[in-house]
C-alpha cells in the first residue's frame, strides 16, 4: 500500500495545507485508491467549505471511488492523460534497457500521479510520498522552457512520434526536454508547458505527425472568434515553428499573474462522470448547469456564459466538447466558477455535440439551444440577441482564417463546420 499525502495550495492559503491521505493499493494490474481526510482539515473553515469531489464527503474515515471506478476524479484531474503517460512509459522503457530499472517494472496510476512535475501540475493539489520530502515530482529541472525553445521542443515531439519503437539514440534527450514541462498535461496530442518573458506559464500544443490538416491554426481561429463573441477564453497565439502547421499556445488559467495556483476540476469530476461518458449515455450540458446552481459562486453569470458556449459550439461544430473539455475553478470561500473555455476545435463533418443539449438530444441545432435557454436563466429575448450576434461574428471565420495564414484549401475543407453561421 502506497501512502500519498494530499495538500491544498490554492492562492488564498498562507501555506500548503494537508487535506488528507490517499492510500493506493495494488489489485492485479491496477491501483485501487482510498482517501481519508485529515481531522485537522475537516475542522479548518478554510478547507472544509466545499466539496472537491462528489465522491469525497466531509467526514472522517476512509472513502472509496464509485462503482466500477478505481480512482477519484479530483486526483485524476491532476494526473497525466495519454500524452503525459506516453512520455513516462517511454522513459521507463529506456531505463529498463539501460539497467536503471528492474525488468518487469510496471507503471501504476499512482506512479503517473506522482510522476507529474509539481511545478507544472494542473490545479492546486500537491502530493508527497509518505508525507516526506518535497512535493512530487521534483526531477528533471525546475524552470519551464522559454518561448525561444519552442522550435526545439516541437522538433523533439515530432521525433518522438516518428520513433514508435523508442529506439533512437536521441530518444532520451527528447524525453528530457519534454517530460518535465509536458508530462502534467491532459489530452492525447503532443504539448508542453512553456514560460513567457514574464514567467507566466502557457501550454504549447504542437502539431502531430498524424495531422492531415492544420489543427493548431484552426484552434486559434476558433479562439479568436470566441473572444470576439465575448466568451471567457484564455489568451491564445499561434505560430509555425518546425512544420507547416501552427503551434497553438494558450495561457494557463489555473495560475494567477503572480504564479499562485488556482484549483481546477473538470466537469467530469464535478458531475461524477467517467471517461467515455457522452451523449450516448445521457451526459448533458444540463448537468454542468446543475453544478453551477448547487455550488456556483456566481451562478447567474456562469449559467449565461455556459449557454452562450453551447450556441458557439453549435456554430463552429466543436464536437469534441466532452466532460474533460469543460472545467471549473475553485473560488475559495464561495464555491465554484466556470473556467475559461478551452480545447475548442471545429470539425468539418460533424453530426452532434459530445454532450446533449436537452436531456436526450445533442444535434447541431440552434432550436435545441433556444429550448433550454430558460434553464440557464437566459430570457427568450436575450437568447435571440446572443444567437444573432454570434452568427454575425462566426460568419467572419474565413477572414480570421486568412489572417492566420490558413490556405484556401484548408478553408474550403473546413467550411462545412461553420455553415450554421450563415443567416
Model-derived features: positions:
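Phosphate/dinucleotide-binding and metal-coordinating scaffold of catalytic cores
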Residues: 1-323, 327-423
